[in-house]
Amino acid sequence: MTAPKLLTDAQMQHFIAHGYLRLRTELPDSFHRGVYQQFDTLIGTDAALNPGNNLLPAVPELNQVFADPIVRGALTSVVGPDYVMHPHRALHNNPPGSDAQRIHKDSYWGYLRRVRNHRSRWAMIMYVPQATPLERGPTGVIPGSQYQSQRPDDALMPEVAGCLETGGFLLIHYDIWHRKMKNFTEDKRFMMKFEFIRMQEPDSPSWDHSDPAWRLDEPPALNLSAVWRRQWNWLRGAPNQDVPVNDIDAAGLASSNPHQRLAAINDIARCTEAARAHRPALAALLRDPLEPIAVDAAYAMASAGPDAMPSLLDVIQGDTEEDLDPDRGSHDGSRPDPGMPARSAAYGLAEIGLPAVPGLLDILSNGAGSRARKLAAFALGEIAGTGTEGIEALCRAKQDPSAAVRINAIEALGLKPASPAAVAALSRAVKDPDPQARFSAALSLAQIGPGAEAAIPALKDALYDENRYVPGYAVEALERIATPGAIRALLPFLKTARWCPHTSPASIY
């Protein structure tokens, strides 16, 4: 197999800031024409034939797309070398004259149940087998919007059409705001969407890296460099640098112009002393009505280190609301989001790291509202080296009455080193009454991998769960555990779940 063609520093910085890249496979046009014909046969005239999550066995040629060196290199670069494919797959048709979709984010946990990742943990590939110019209804994305949960302001963050040539694909951050655009032509437009998950925390760059400096040439409409620089350093496994900054326009923090507020925040974020000096003003910006400013301010506060912790912890502790989110699908972000200040604070505390752990543990155990406890669980998961105390607290949180808290605690355990306590807690969580908690537990066990051998009996049962994603993650977990016992548990399920791509209504045997 040809070696993956990794992204460059410039491409990675574009992805971090903009949230997407346009790339093209190396496969010939004849391959893409064949895929187009198969897609047309499946859903070109009858959406009822859409194979949904069975797309890959229905069109096994698509495995060549994911074996392509450009695709493998892009995914290796943004989600690490041992990424896995999510069990959800989607084939989308944009027929002639089809209306545009609403701008949305995808979700399996409900719109606000799970805290959205800023770090590059999930990515999507949107592949098209035909040329997709603007008039044919490409995917539209809002550059830089992966760092906000509320729908972006159109005037501040304009949409970009992800136009692609034949065999092209969009690589997007899972949490970017996007939509299907209107097809003005008489031609069909097909797009398939696959999702990929990081399985290991980065300790070094996984792309073609040569220059540690942040040198983004063309930023998106809103400059969140306080956020971007930290994502860059996290992906490199590198510490954040303290850079003395002269002539900071601190008055810009109070400007009515959002670009001036961001410019001041970004300058302050580069310098520890400046962040300490302007901490009260930054803390006030956590409640800015524009979410990008609140988020950028939280990252700038992280530059102040432990000095910023009381302000950030107080914002989370002061959120006493219950985290009720019955919406299980995508949402257009139009409803009010009172949890924005506390969520922004959680991102800042995650960046501060280990000094924030005691305060977060207290909120996780004693927070008056489930939203605060959820945010504490999330931030603890993002912080490396929380130790036995952190793992034990997250294990206890698996018993929280709020499904949102349990889901975030379960996910956090998957980001920690393997431990008997975590594996036991996750094995029990695979039987949680909430389906999202169950599939999050199976994914966390997959991330732990060989250290989760004790979970084999629970994972064997999970293969037959009524929720379609629990078995998908259980398969990944058993494969990654890879002991003879894990393989013996896995093979009978795979044999009965086998799909024959050669069988159709026209040829049933």
Regions found by a protein language model. Name each.
Residues M1-R114:
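Non-heme Fe(II)-dependent double-stranded beta-helix
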Residues M181-A251, P258-A275:
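Non-heme Fe(II)/2-oxoglutarate
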Residues L164-H178:
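Conserved metal-binding segment of the jelly-roll/cupin
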Residues S256-N257, P289-L290, D319-E321, D337-P338, ...:
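Short inter-helical turns and helix N-cap capping residues of alpha-solenoid HEAT/ARM repeat scaffolds
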Residues L222-D242, H259-A274, A284, P292-D307, ...:
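Structural detector for internal amphipathic alpha-helices that build alpha-solenoid repeat scaffolds
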Residues D242-A254, E273-R287, P306-H331, L354-S365, ...:
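Amphipathic alpha-helical scaffolding segments comprising HEAT/armadillo-like alpha-solenoid repeats
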Residues D99-C163:
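Catalytic core of non-heme Fe(II) oxygenases with the double-stranded beta-helix
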